[in-house]
């Protein structure tokens, strides 16, 4: 795992996600679910490794929409604990570079990659997605799920994604945007304070992406469908394995997100864009 010192401005983001004991919490949850932590599979991690709305369902759909193939060089921009990168490597056979600004997430992602036998397919680096340590045209696909909400400078975020994409490259997004009402009910999964959340409307996001050099190939507002699924799931008893295993107050954060969507304070957008 390569370490790149995060910028000072990333401190609020790191504080939102890092607890200092994520690996221990995951090991405890795996053991409680009857798993042998010395012999885990990608299937064992399915319920706890995708830190975004709809979890594995959203990841599968986005990979399919982006038409990721084995020969593609893929960047998982904002990998969290690496669930998306592992699914792409395991299901598509692609080589994946995974970056996140939170060092603890990268440490846990590297551990889990090695644990399920995918360490040789995924290169994890601590890096800022607005200042990527890669040459131009290094990737064929950039995947980013629930990342830009923490980033104020979205022009720089997407300009960097455009810079590292080769001609014909694709940007695949599953993200939260602002709705027509405000403010947000907090906490939500990406923010406990207003200073940590930087939402823009879908229309503004399309404008920013266009200014960065992208054209929309697919754009779908899945807000209500996703909110219905999340409401039904999180109103029931929670399994031993889940994001609540290592994300403090996770159920409260998710139900606030559902409420924000219902009141049009937030929306969920699935998109694939092409390089212009």
Residue positions per predicted region:
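A short glycine-rich, Lys/Arg-flanked "PGG" loop and its adjoining helix->strand segment in the class I
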Residues: 155-170
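A short SAM/SAH-binding and catalytic strip from SAM-dependent methyltransferases
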Residues: 141-153
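A short acidic, Gly/Pro-enriched loop at the edge of an enzyme's catalytic core
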Residues: 130-141
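Conserved Class I S-adenosyl-L-methionine
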Residues: 218-276
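Conserved alpha-helix/loop element of class I SAM-dependent methyltransferases that forms part
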Residues: 52-70
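Short, glycine-/aromatic-enriched active-site segment of Class I SAM-dependent methyltransferases
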Residues: 176-196
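Class I SAM-dependent methyltransferase SAM/SAH-binding core
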Residues: 73-77, 81-131
């Amino acid at each position: 795992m390569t370490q790149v010192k995060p910028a000072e401005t990333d401190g609020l983001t790191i504080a939102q996600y890092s607890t200092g004991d994520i690996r221990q919490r995951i090991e405890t949850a795996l053991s409680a679910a009857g798993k042998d932590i010395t012999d885990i599979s990608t299937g064992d991690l399915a319920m706890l490794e995708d830190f975004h709305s709809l979890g594995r369902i959203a990841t599968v759909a986005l990979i399919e929409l982006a038409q990721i193939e084995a020969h593609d060089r893929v960047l998982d921009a904002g990998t969290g604990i690496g669930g998306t990168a592992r699914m792409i490597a395991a299901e598509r056979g692609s080589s994946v570079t995974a970056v996140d600004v939170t060092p603890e997430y990268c440490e846990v992602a590297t551990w889990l990659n090695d644990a399920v036998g995918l360490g040789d397919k995924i290169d994890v680096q601590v890096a800022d997605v607005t200042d990527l340590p890669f040459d131009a045209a290094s990737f064929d696909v950039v995947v980013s799920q629930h990342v830009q909400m923490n980033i104020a400078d979205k022009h720089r975020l997407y300009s960097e994604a455009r810079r590292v994409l080769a001609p014909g490259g694709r940007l695949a997004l599953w993200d939260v945007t602002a709705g027509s009402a405000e403010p947000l009910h907090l906490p939500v999964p990406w923010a406990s304070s207003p200073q940590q959340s930087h939402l823009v409307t879908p229309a503004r996001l399309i404008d920013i992406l266009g200014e960065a050099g992208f054209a929309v190939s697919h754009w779908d507002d899945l807000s209500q469908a996703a909110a219905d699924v999340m409401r039904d799931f999180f109103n029931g008893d929670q399994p031993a394995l889940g994001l609540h295993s290592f994300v403090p107050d996770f159920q409260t954060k998710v139900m606030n997100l559902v409420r924000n969507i219902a009141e049009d304070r937030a929306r969920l957008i699935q998109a694939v864009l092409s390089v212009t």
